[in-house]
Amino acid sequence: MRLNTLSPAEGAKHSAKRLGRGIGSGLGKTGGRGHKGQKSRTGGGVRRGFEGGQMPLYRRLPKFGFTSMKSAVTAEVRLNELTKVEGNVVTLETLKAANILTKDIQFAKVILAGEVKSAVTIRGLRVTKGAKAAIEAAGGSIEE
């Protein structure tokens, strides 16, 4: 077997539909577009959300709420990720150094997911009740 003899498995590749190549092909003349109408023309079609002139759904419904930009710079940290941090003090900077958080994250919260194996000190991070109990049970502490 050589590189120039390789070929895909039988039936793995389908031949492309060749439109407008005669009556016998079954896709000649109109090429599967039917007769006349906007969708049969070149560049024909309607934009997303267009409902034929009827007031579209996205304009019938009222505006509400907004997306907080704080959510883009906030992250959750699982308990089992704390073991990747060097040393036993966990801060925002040490989490970034361990590649657990990206550099643009400004706020983080430790959540109860997984388990903490060693005693760690959490400094300057928010912690859920369950995570706090698990950290303290492992001999760790939380500093504000």
Swiss-Prot record:
Its GO biological process annotations read: translation
List all Gly residues biased stretches: 21-31
Note the superkingdom of the native organism: Bacteria
Cellular component (GO) terms are: cytosolic large ribosomal subunit
Tell me which UniProt keywords the record has, alphabetically: Ribonucleoprotein, Ribosomal protein, RNA-binding, rRNA-binding
Coiled-coil region: none
Q: Which GO terms describe its molecular function?
A: rRNA binding; structural constituent of ribosome
- Per the record, which residues fall in region Disordered? 1-53
Taken from the UniProt record, the cysteine pairs bridged by disulfide bonds within this chain are none
Against Pfam families, the record matches this protein to:
Ribosomal_L27A
The family database entries (InterPro entries) matched by this protein are listed as: Ribosomal_uL15, Ribosomal_uL15/eL18, Ribosomal_uL15/eL18_sf, Ribosomal_uL15_bac-type, Ribosomal_uL15_CS
Does the record's keyword annotation contain rRNA-binding? yes
HAMAP family xrefs: Ribosomal_uL15
Q: Function of this protein?
A: Binds to the 23S rRNA.
What the record says about family reads: Belongs to the universal ribosomal protein uL15 family.
The record's note on quaternary structure and interaction partners says: Part of the 50S ribosomal subunit.
The record ties this protein, via PANTHER family, to:
50S RIBOSOMAL PROTEIN L15, LARGE RIBOSOMAL SUBUNIT PROTEIN UL15M
Q: What is this protein called?
A: Large ribosomal subunit protein uL15
Q: Which organism is it from?
A: Haemophilus influenzae (strain PittGG)
Q: Upper taxonomic classification of the species? A: Bacteria, Pseudomonadati, Pseudomonadota, Gammaproteobacteria, Pasteurellales
Tell me what gene encodes this: rplO
